UniProtKB/Swiss-Prot annotation:
Binding site for CTP: 13, 148-150, 188-193, 224
PROSITE patterns named among the record's database cross-references: GATASE_TYPE_1 (PS51273)
Keywords in alphabetical order: ATP-binding, Glutamine amidotransferase, Ligase, Magnesium, Metal-binding, Nucleotide-binding, Pyrimidine biosynthesis
Protein family (similarity comment): Belongs to the CTP synthase family.
Residue intervals passing through the bilayer: none
Alphabetical list of CDD domains matching this protein: CTPS_N, GATase1_CTP_Synthase
Residue span of region Amidoligase domain: 1-267
Record protein name field: CTP synthase
A GO CC term assigned to this protein in UniProt: cytosol
Lineage of the organism: Bacteria, Bacillati, Chloroflexota, Dehalococcoidia, Dehalococcoidales
Species in which this protein is naturally found: Dehalococcoides mccartyi (strain ATCC BAA-2266 / KCTC 15142 / 195) (Dehalococcoides ethenogenes (strain 195))
Miscellaneous note of the record: CTPSs have evolved a hybrid strategy for distinguishing between UTP and CTP. The overlapping regions of the product feedback inhibitory and substrate sites recognize a common feature in both compounds, the triphosphate moiety. To differentiate isosteric substrate and product pyrimidine rings, an additional pocket far from the expected kinase/ligase catalytic site, specifically recognizes the cytosine and ribose portions of the product inhibitor.
Single Gene Ontology BP annotation: pyrimidine nucleobase biosynthetic process
PANTHER family: CTP SYNTHASE, CTP SYNTHASE-RELATED
Key word Transferase present: no
């Protein structure tokens, strides 16, 4: 039977629950335990697939095609596992299912209430993940902050889980912020005390409190929180701000979190072995020259919109013995001012995914700059599509080339709607989503990067390369180096004779790991580090 770790957050949002949960999974896995993770999101959207990147940040896609919170990407990267749709639960999903059951008559005419019907549905989804994953430990993060109205049913559900599963099988961890008052130069514990009191009113007594702070925490604060929050002194965990998020598992382990979890849950675990992870962190902290990459995007004001891309660049830089400097370039600025001002100093250009026509011409201009100046280029999803459009416009001199996403009546639609998408009006969960196989052509940049003939990558798109133009572009120097097994869909294209110019219709950033960078990102940074523009770049911190 699985054991359960429930993680809540207090005082403020964005306190670091997601990284804490990912780090707990890392620690438990280092002790030979199998781990699965789940995120409970209280918002009423069914999933974040139709949410604005400015509202939600990145949409992370699982292997089976679920559109999820970016925290699931952190879980996968830290624990090195692949999650499924069972790992994401939203209020929208829960309430939709409860209402559907009521309409079918499943409740036999009963009055439908938050307790017990909504809470039972939440608990059923938690238990479903445990049953299907058969993990030794299931870690469940409750999104939002204690006190949020929409989070109340989820907190009530996890409160009930301890009675349902037994006290030795459930543990509660509360992640909270200790704010620093500059005028008095002290950390304050009162917000944490109030947050814990709110949890206790609901019926949840935290077993462990993880205290986030930007300044050193004294032992006196540990004593105070232990007294007022009724938590053992050794279970008050200090988590200071660190230079790289990948150091968090080491900090938590040094605070004794792993031993606490094993003891409280009576786990049959091996001794902790974080030696490989420790070596990774040491490598990250080594001062090395930086490689400077321009990320040209639509949503660069909110960097979390490209969270997995950013982390994948960091992973590739680690592997190549470099730090990373990312220039966040707004595509519309290139449209207004031209590319030179933004791209003249960079050693590589990457264009990630996105939707809509805004900024497209700026992206096409950036691709042209990379192609003509021999600057390594990596295009992801939309980034591949604008690469094809640019090639058709400026190499084939077909200035009307476009995507039907942006110009439905284009006379030269090199990018077109997938056949199965025609007639689909609903936006939510209807794209080509999740893992699909791809056959790599030997003797290509992609072939050199992967070293395998058959790969599986994650997708999230409606539009695809138009095969009517495959022969024409191929004769002009575009190489179609990755195809679907039936040869009908172009998955990877590249420009022959260029140091590195590769576009993928899929999202390779979802499969990169800190100790195993994705092959396309690895080779992109390898090519970029060889480019010298205005001398070597200064060493910069790895985590942006």
């Amino acid at each position: 039977m699985s054991k359960f770790v429930f993680v809540t957050g207090g005082v403020v949002s964005s306190v670091g629950k997601g990284i804490t949960v990912a780090s707990l999974g890392n620690i438990l896995k280092s002790r030979g335990l199998s781990v699965s993770v789940q995120k409970l999101d209280p918002y009423l959207n069914v999933d974040p697939g139709t949410m604005s990147p400015y509202q939600h940040g990145e949409v992370f896609v699982t292997q089976d095609g679920a559109e999820t919170d970016l925290d699931l990407g952190s879980y996968e990267r830290f624990i090195d596992i692949e999650l499924t749709a069972d790992s994401t639960v939203t209020s929208g999903q829960v309430y939709s299912e409860v209402i559907n059951k009521e309409r079918r008559g499943d409740y036999l005419g009963g009055t439908i209430q938050v307790v017990p019907h909504v809470t039972q549905e939440i608990k059923a989804r938690i238990q479903r993940l445990a049953d299907r994953s058969k993990a030794d430990v299931v870690i469940v993060e409750v999104g939002g902050t204690v006190g949020d109205i929409e989070g109340q049913p989820f907190l009530e559900a996890i409160r009930q889980m301890r009675n349902d599963m037994g006290r030795d099988n459930v543990i509660y961890i509360h992640v909270t912020l200790l704010p620093y008052i500059q005028s008095t130069q002290e950390l304050k514990t009162k917000p944490t005390q109030h947050s814990v009191n709110e949890l206790r009113r609901i019926g949840i007594q935290p077993d462990i409190i993880v205290c986030r702070a930007d300044y050193p925490i004294s032992e006196g604060i540990r004593d105070k929180l232990s007294l007022f929050c009724d938590v053992e002194r050794k279970a008050v965990i200090f988590m200071p701000t660190v230079s790289t998020i990948y150091e968090v598992p080491l900090k938590l382990e040094s605070e004794g979190v792993g031993d606490l979890l094993v003891s409280r849950l009576h786990l049959n675990a091996s001794p902790s072995d974080l030696s490989i992870w420790r070596g990774l962190v040491e490598k990250i902290k080594e001062p090395t020259p930086a490689v400077r990459i321009a990320l040209v995007g639509k949503y660069v004001e909110l960097k979390d919109a490209y969270y997995s891309v950013r982390e994948s660049l960091c992973h590739a830089a680690i592997h190549n013995g470099r730090d990373i400097q990312i220039d966040w370039v707004y595509a519309e600025d290139i449209e207004k001012n031209g590319p030179e001002e933004y791209l003249k100093h960079v050693q590589g250009i990457i264009i990630p995914g996105g939707f809509g026509i805004r900024g497209i011409e700026g992206m096409i201009t950036a691709v042209k700059y990379a192609r003509e100046n021999g600057i390594p280029y990596l295009g992801l999803c939309l980034g591949m599509q604008v690469m094809v459009i640019e090639f058709a416009r400026h190499v084939l001199q077909s200035d009307k080339a476009h995507s039907t996403e942006f110009e439905p009546d284009s006379p030269y639609p090199v990018i077109d709607l997938l056949p199965e998408q025609r007639g689909v009006d609903s936006k939510g969960g209807t794209m080509r989503l999740g893992n699909y196989p791809c056959v790599i052509q030997p003797g290509t940049m992609a072939g050199q990067a992967y070293g395998n003939k058959l790969i599986n990558e994650r997708h999230r798109h409606r539009f695809e390369f138009n095969n009517d133009y495959r022969d024409t572009l191929s004769k002009a120097g575009m190489v179609f180096s990755g195809l679907s097994p039936d040869g009908k869909l172009v998955e990877i294209c590249e420009v022959s004779g260029h140091p590195f110019m590769v576009g993928s219709q899929f999202h390779p950033e979802f499969l990169s790991r800190p100790n195993r960078p994705h092959p396309l990102f690895r080779e992109f940074i390898n090519a970029a580090k060889k480019v010298i523009r205005d001398g070597e770049q200064p060493s910069l911190p790895l985590s942006p």
